[in-house]
């Protein structure tokens, strides 16, 4: 599987999963040894360390490691809104969403003392484009960067992209996290040191790779009022139970949450919050009927949706932390009424199968994986489809990378899917468009293509309405059989301000780490 394909998968799934599921296949370890925190020290638990600290090539699962030390061009608040970062103004120039202008903040210095300039940001973007990281492909259509002034750039793209603010905020780690000119002059050091304009700087002398990462305040930070901690430490704790124990014993203060340990976290008095983000269910890939002729008929795909009792599956797998859905997004495009499109109706499912010429059902091959409870979801669906005559022949791949490869290679007519909420145009590139990784058979639909082309060039004021039409079309086509929203979230001790834990949205399910601050009086 190509590195670009892996990158596209990670934008769809790993953007959403972040560090939540990283420990699924990692052996247990004991909690870290106890130790006191310095005054106003934030101690974070993560399940895996970063392979590199270079923003241009870091895995998005490791975003917090760079967000502490680098400022984004645009800041995505935990509530999903955008606010100024290194850029004070931004927006599209003219019509068509191919030109984008950025005005940079005056007087900003990086941690190494170099100044923020338009020339420096141009150099940064050119580096990210050619670095081969997860976001390099996003800049593939970046045709030119014009420096229109000491603090002003105009970016021209060869194809429209209506979601550039999404990429220039923290979601676009690599693109958004601007590296200093001095850092770019010595790229080899970017893997182990930081060269950003963020609130903190890595203390490399106190850092032990893949164990402990220590950050201290950046004396040059442009927004000193929002430096909330005297020290930030990230401790690597691979096992979920060990991570929870570290929180309960006060050895760490904050971490991502997992619904499998949520009840115990609540019982221990921790602050918990979960946001629906990843839709889990079946991806009915073979819509042209190459391997499974039955799936070429929309009535069959709709029958599969009618045959699923979503509520019972969600309750069994996610408990109160999940919610049923028939949709692919929980952000722009989500329509509450679409969740009533396919009520549990086995009789309706059998009727549609009979009308399509399959009164006795059929057998459908599905590739799955235990990752993020994929196998559990597929087996639950299989039990319900059996009652309408559809037998799932499940091939589980314990190696998630093998699963991705098989799913994307058009060797199976259906697959488990766990896909995180993204802006609709970004989803077109990753989920449902003809070149999307999750569209292995390159399915197309004239109406879907028309709407996506409209979205690509639409002004922001029209994007939500077009996204809703796209989602309605996807649900009607029944290209997928979503079952429920798998929740993502975070845990915190009472030391942390509750707002840092609870303010999240579907497109931003994990908090912006620089927004985490001490509770009042702590």
Residue map of PLM features:
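N-terminal lobe/hinge region of extracytoplasmic solute-binding protein
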Residues: 45-93, 126, 195-196
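Alpha-helical secondary-structure segments
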Residues: 117-124, 150-156, 199, 229-231, ...
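Ligand-site clamp/hinge motif
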Residues: 220-264, 391
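Aromatic- and charge-enriched surface segment that lines or borders ligand/interaction sites
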Residues: 89-132, 148, 154, 294
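Gly/Pro-rich hinge or "lid" segments in bacterial periplasmic/extracellular proteins
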Residues: 170-224, 231
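Surface-exposed binding/hinge segments that line
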Residues: 103, 137-181
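Structural transition elements
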Residues: 200, 291, 322-355, 373
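Detector for C-terminal structural segments
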Residues: 37, 308-333, 372-382, 402-522
């Amino acid at each position: 599987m190509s590195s670009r394909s892996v990158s596209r998968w990670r934008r769809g799934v790993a953007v959403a999963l972040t560090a939540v599921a990283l420990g699924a296949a990692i052996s247990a370890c004991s909690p870290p040894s106890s130790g006191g925190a310095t005054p106003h020290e934030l101690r974070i638990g993560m399940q895996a360390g970063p392979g590199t600290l270079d923003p241009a090539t870091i895995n998005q699962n490791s975003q917090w490691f760079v967000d502490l030390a680098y400022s984004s061009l645009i800041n995505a608040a935990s509530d999903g809104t955008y606010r100024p970062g290194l850029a004070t103004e931004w927006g599209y120039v003219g019509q068509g969403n191919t030109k984008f202008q950025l005005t940079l903040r005056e007087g900003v210095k990086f941690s190494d003392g170099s100044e923020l300039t338009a020339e420096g940001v141009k150099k940064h973007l050119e580096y990210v484009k050619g670095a081969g990281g997860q976001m390099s492909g996003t800049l593939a259509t970046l045709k030119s960067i014009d420096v229109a002034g000491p603090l002003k750039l105009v970016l021209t793209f060869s194809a429209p992209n209506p979601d550039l603010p999404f990429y220039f905020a923290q979601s676009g780690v690599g693109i958004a996290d601007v590296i200093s000119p001095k850092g770019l002059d010595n790229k080899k050091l970017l893997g182990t040191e930081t060269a950003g304009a963020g609130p903190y700087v890595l203390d490399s002398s106190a850092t032990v790779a893949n164990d402990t990462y220590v950050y201290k305040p950046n004396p040059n930070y442009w927004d000193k009022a929002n430096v909330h901690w005297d020290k930030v430490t990230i401790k690597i704790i691979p096992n979920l139970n060990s991570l929870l124990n570290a929180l309960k014993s006060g050895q760490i203060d904050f971490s991502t949450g997992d619904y499998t340990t949520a009840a115990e976290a609540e019982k221990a008095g921790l602050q918990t919050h979960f946001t629906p983000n990843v839709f889990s269910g079946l991806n009915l890939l073979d819509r042209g009927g190459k391997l499974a002729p039955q799936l070429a008929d929309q009535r069959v795909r709709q029958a599969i949706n009618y045959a699923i009792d979503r509520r019972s599956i969600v309750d069994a797998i996610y408990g109160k932390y999940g919610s049923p859905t028939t949709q692919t997004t929980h952000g722009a495009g989500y329509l509450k009424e679409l969740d009533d499109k396919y009520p549990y109706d086995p009789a309706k499912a059998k009727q549609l199968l009979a009308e399509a010429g399959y009164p006795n059902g059929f057998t459908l091959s599905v590739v799955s994986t235990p990752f993020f409870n994929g196998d559990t979801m597929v087996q639950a669906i299989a039990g319900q489809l059996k009652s309408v005559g559809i037998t799932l022949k499940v091939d589980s791949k314990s190696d998630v990378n093998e699963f991705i490869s098989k799913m994307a290679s058009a060797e199976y007519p259906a697959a488990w899917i766990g896909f995180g909420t993204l802006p609709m145009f970004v989803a077109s590139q990753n989920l449902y468009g003809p070149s999307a990784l999750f569209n292995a058979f390159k399915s197309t639909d004239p109406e879907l293509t028309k709407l996506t082309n409209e979205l690509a060039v639409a002004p922001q004021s029209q994007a939500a309405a077009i996204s809703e039409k796209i989602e309605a079309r996807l649900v009607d086509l029944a290209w997928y059989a979503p079952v429920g929203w798998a929740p993502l979230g975070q845990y915190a001790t009472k030391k942390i301000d509750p707002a840092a834990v609870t303010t999240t949205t579907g497109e931003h399910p994990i908090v912006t780490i620089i927004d985490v601050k001490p509770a009042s009086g702590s």
